[in-house]
Amino acid sequence: MDKIQKIPDSEVIYLTSDLHFFHDNIIEHCERPCTKEDHIDWILNKINSVVKPEDIVYHLGDFAYGSNAKFSSLQEVFSQLNGTWRFIIGNHDKEKQLEALCQGTPHEVLGEYHSFYYKKRKIVMLHYPMETWDGKGRGRNSIHFHGHIHNKKITEIENRHNVCLDNEHKVYLLDDFL
């Protein structure tokens, strides 16, 4: 069994999901306060106004909208984002495309599920919300972060958090949940 990574307490970590670059219908579907023409700039501003180049960003799925995302366009957008990005695969992601995007960079694709320890808490990440997760029964020591549901409301479960961009139109600082 692999040992779960411990992230240094000094790291600044942000969480987000479901950016849906190159998905025009998401603007209306999730009531994003922008137009088709300024959608990419709106997303970049939401991220870069908070995330610094030295920060870590975990993206929990659906970075771009499948076949709508031309690789060269995606590279151009990705090069403008602050932070070191770590990707969890979502239902609209093309894993090979994300891997190619990260090739030769400090960014990485982590697969469909990832967990680590940070400030004595177990952090569990998946694109989809889970009813239960590793460590959930151990009090407040384990926290699950997910995306997928955008701005839809689901039954609240202690220590389960939706970090979709559409939830509050922001990226989330992990420390705010600890």
Predicted region positions:
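Conserved beta-sheet core of the metallophosphoesterase superfamily
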Residues: Q103-L178
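A short acidic-Thr-Gly-centered motif at the start of a beta-strand
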Residues: M1-P8, W133-G137
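Conserved catalytic motifs of the protein kinase core domain
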Residues: V12, I56, S142
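Short, hydrophobic/glycine-enriched beta-strand segments
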Residues: I13-D18, N162-V163
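Core catalytic region of metal-dependent phosphoesterases/phosphodiesterases
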Residues: K6-I7, T16, F21, N25-Y113, ...
